[in-house]
Regions:
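Residue-level signature of mid-helix packing/kink "hotspots" within the transmembrane helices
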Residues: 7-15, 105
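Helix-to-loop junctions at the C-terminal end of transmembrane segments
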Residues: 12-31, 115-116
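A late C-terminal transmembrane helix in Major Facilitator Superfamily
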Residues: 86-116
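Loop-to-transmembrane helix entry
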Residues: 1-10, 56, 91-95
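A membrane-interface helix-boundary motif in multi-pass transporters
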Residues: 110-133
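C-terminal ends and interior cores of transmembrane alpha-helices
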Residues: 35-52, 139
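Multi-pass alpha-helical transporter architecture, strongest
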Residues: 126-158
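Intracellular juxtamembrane helix-capping segments at the cytosolic ends
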Residues: 69-85
C-alpha cells in the first residue's frame, strides 16, 4: 500500500501543489498547505481509534502523501521566492532548505517518548497542535506585508551592484 498507493498519492499531490502554486498567490498557497498538513495528522489520530483495516490504512497513506507533496511544492516555491539574489541564490536555498530539516531531526527522538506516554491518538492530536506556531508565524508574516514584498518584481543587477 505504501509503495504503490503512496507513490501515486505523492505524484498526484505534487501535481496538485503545482496547480495551487500557479493558481493562487503565495500567501494563500502557504495557508492552504499548512492547514492541509495540519489536518493530515488528524487522519492518523482517526486511524488510531478505528479498527484495523486496509481501507483505513490506504486512506491515511493517501492523505499524508498527497498533502505532504502539496506542502513540499509550496514550500519550495516559498524558498525560491526568498532566494532572489542573483549572486547568492544557490547558497541561500541550500541554507534555508538545510534549516528546514532541523525541526524534523531534533523532534523525531522525543516523539517516540511522547507517543509511548500519551498513546497514538493523543500523540497525533498533539502533533496537529504543534502546527499552531507555524500558523501564527504565517499570520505575523502576512500582517507585516511579507508575501506582498516577495511578489514585487526585483530589478536586475546593475554595474554598481
Amino acid at each position: 500500500i505504501v509503495k504503490g498507493l503512496g507513490l501515486a498519492a505523492t505524484l498526484a499531490g505534487g501535481f496538485a501543489g503545482g496547480f495551487v502554486a500557479r493558481g493562487l498567490d503565495l500567501r494563500t498557497s502557504m495557508w492552504l498547505a499548512a492547514l492541509l498538513q495540519m489536518g493530515s495528522n488528524l487522519v492518523f489520530a482517526l486511524q488510531a481509534v478505528m479498527p484495523a483495516s486496509y481501507g483505513m490504512l490506504a486512506f491515511v497513506i493517501v492523505a499524508e502523501n498527497f498533502t505532504g507533496a502539496i506542502g513540499t511544492v509550496i514550500f519550495v516555491a516559498y524558498l525560491s521566492a526568498l532566494c532572489q539574489s542573483p549572486l547568492h541564490t544557490a547558497t541561500q536555498y541550500a541554507l534555508l532548505s538545510a534549516l528546514s530539516a532541523v525541526g524534523r531531526t531534533y523532534i523525531s527522538a522525543p516523539a517516540g517518548f511522547v507517543a509511548a506516554q500519551t498513546g497514538w491518538f493523543w500523540f497525533f492530536v498533539l502533533s496537529c497542535l504543534t502546527a499552531i506556531p507555524s500558523l501564527i508565524l504565517l499570520w505575523w508574516l502576512q500582517s507585516r506585508g511579507h508575501f506582498e514584498a516577495l511578489a514585487r518584481p526585483r530589478g536586475k543587477l546593475s554595474a554598481e551592484d
